[in-house]
C-alpha cells in the first residue's frame, strides 16, 4: 500500500535532467563516464542506436536567410532576446525540435529552433527574425556569440577529454541512458 508520505517523498524527488554537459572521462564498452560542468560524475549507458554528432565553429556570416537554426536566448536589456549561442542545422536535420521552449542553460533562457526569415546586419551584430510553426521571434546575435554547426561523428569521437552534451533518460532500474551525444571538435565546448 502506498502511503501519503511515500507519495510526498516521490513528489519531492528532483527531476532527472534530460541532458548532461561536460567532459568525457572514459568509455568502457557501452558505458560513457562524464564529469559534468557542475563537477558530478555521471555514468551513461550508450544505446545501441545512439547518434553521435560533431560540432564545429562557423562564422556569424554563415547564418543565412532560410537556414534552420537553434538558438539559446536570454532576455536582453531592450526586451529583444539575446543569443547565448546559435547552432546551424544541416539540411537533413531541418525541423529538429522546431518551436520555442524554456531551456536549462542559463536562468530565464529559452531554446528556439526555427528558420531564419530575415537577417539585418548592424554595428553590434545581426538581428535575426526567425519563424517556427507556432510563432516567430526576433533575436540579437552579437559578434562574440558562439556559432556552430553539426558535422558527422561517431563513437570514436567520444574519448577522454572530449567536451560533450548528451541527451539522456532515466531507465526503470534508475540508470541513465543516452541515445544522442554532440561532441565538440578541435577543443570546442558545445555552447548549448
Model-predicted regions and their roles:
Residues 6-192:
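Short, flexible, surface-exposed loop segments at domain boundaries
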Residues 1-5:
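Sec-dependent N-terminal signal peptides
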Amino acid at each position: 500500500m502506498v502511503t501519503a508520505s511515500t507519495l510526498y517523498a516521490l513528489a519531492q524527488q528532483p527531476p532527472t535532467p534530460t541532458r548532461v554537459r561536460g567532459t568525457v572521462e572514459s568509455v568502457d564498452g557501452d558505458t560513457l563516464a562524464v564529469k559534468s560542468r557542475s563537477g558530478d560524475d555521471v555514468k551513461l549507458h550508450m544505446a545501441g542506436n545512439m547518434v553521435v554528432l560533431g560540432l564545429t565553429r562557423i562564422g556569424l556570416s554563415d547564418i543565412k536567410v532560410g537556414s534552420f537554426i537553434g538558438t539559446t536566448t536570454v532576455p536582453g536589456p531592450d526586451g529583444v532576446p539575446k543569443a547565448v549561442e546559435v547552432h546551424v542545422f544541416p539540411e537533413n536535420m531541418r525541423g529538429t525540435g522546431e518551436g520555442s521552449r524554456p531551456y536549462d542553460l542559463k536562468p530565464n533562457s529559452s531554446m528556439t529552433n526555427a528558420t531564419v526569415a530575415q537577417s539585418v546586419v548592424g554595428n553590434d551584430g545581426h538581428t535575426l527574425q526567425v519563424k517556427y510553426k507556432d510563432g516567430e521571434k526576433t533575436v540579437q546575435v552579437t559578434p562574440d556569440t558562439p556559432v556552430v554547426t553539426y558535422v558527422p561523428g561517431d563513437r570514436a569521437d567520444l574519448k577522454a577529454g572530449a567536451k560533450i552534451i548528451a541527451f539522456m533518460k532515466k531507465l526503470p532500474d534508475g540508470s541513465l541512458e543516452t541515445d544522442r551525444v554532440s561532441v565538440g571538435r578541435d577543443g570546442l565546448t558545445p555552447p548549448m
